[in-house]
C-alpha cells in the first residue's frame, strides 16, 4: 500500500527503491521502476504493471523481464506471471503479502474507521502520490486494496492464481 517509484524531483525527492535501481544499472542491468496505483486491487495493479512490462519488452527487445515486488507489489508481480508467464523470467517478493495482512483484516472490520481512512486515502494521500510521480491518472481505492491485502482476499487470489512458490 502507498507504493510509488519516485516522488518529487531529483534535487528534492524520495526514491521508493532508494539506491537499488542505480546500483543495478551501474552493474550493467537495465532497470525500470513501474508506476502503478498506490491503492487498488491486486488485479487492477497487475493490469497496470502488465502494460508497462509490455512496453519494456517492446523498448528493450528482451523477451522476458525479472520482476521485484515489495509488500502489495509481491501479489501484483505474481498476477503478471499468472496471466502472461511468457513475459516473466523471475519473480522476487520482498516483504510481500502473499498470505494477507491481519492489519488489513482489522481495518476492514472497523467500518467507521475504514470509511474515514478511505476518504483521506482515496482523495488526498493517493492522488498526492500519483501527482508526485507525475502520473495523476493513477486512481486510488483503499477498500479494494485492503480487500486484496486481507487474509481472505489473499486466499481467494492464491486459489485463482496458484503458484508452486507458496507451500500449502
Model segments located where?
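Serine-dependent carboxylesterase/thioesterase catalytic core
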Residues: 47-155
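Short, flexible coil/linker elements and helix-boundary hinge sites characteristic
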Residues: 13, 136, 161-162
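Glycine-rich, aromatic-lined ligand/substrate-binding cores of catalytic
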Residues: 151-168
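Active-site catalytic motif of lipid deacylating hydrolases and related acyltransferases
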Residues: 1-65, 113-123
Amino acid at each position: 500500500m502507498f507504493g510509488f517509484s519516485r516522488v518529487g524531483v531529483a534535487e528534492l525527492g524520495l526514491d521508493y527503491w532508494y539506491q537499488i535501481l542505480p546500483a543495478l544499472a551501474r552493474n550493467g542491468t537495465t532497470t525500470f521502476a513501474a508506476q502503478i496505483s498506490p491503492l487498488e486491487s491486486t488485479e487492477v495493479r497487475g493490469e497496470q504493471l502488465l502494460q508497462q512490462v509490455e512496453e519494456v519488452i517492446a523498448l528493450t527487445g528482451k523477451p522476458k523481464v525479472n520482476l521485484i515486488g515489495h509488500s502489495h507489489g509481491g501479489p501484483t508481480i505474481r498476477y503478471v506471471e499468472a496471466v502472461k508467464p511468457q513475459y516473466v523470467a523471475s519473480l522476487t517478493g520482498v516483504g510481500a503479502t502473499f498470505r494477507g495482512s491481519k492489519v488489513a483484516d482489522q481495518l476492514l472490520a472497523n467500518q467507521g474507521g475504514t470509511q474515514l481512512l478511505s476518504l483521506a486515502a482515496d482523495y488526498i494521500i493517493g492522488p498526492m502520490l500519483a501527482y508526485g510521480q507525475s502520473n495523476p491518472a493513477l486512481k486510488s481505492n483503499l477498500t479494494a486494496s485492503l480487500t486484496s491485502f486481507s487474509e481472505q482476499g489473499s486466499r481467494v487470489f492464491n486459489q485463482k492464481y496458484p503458484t508452486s512458490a507458496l507451500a500449502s
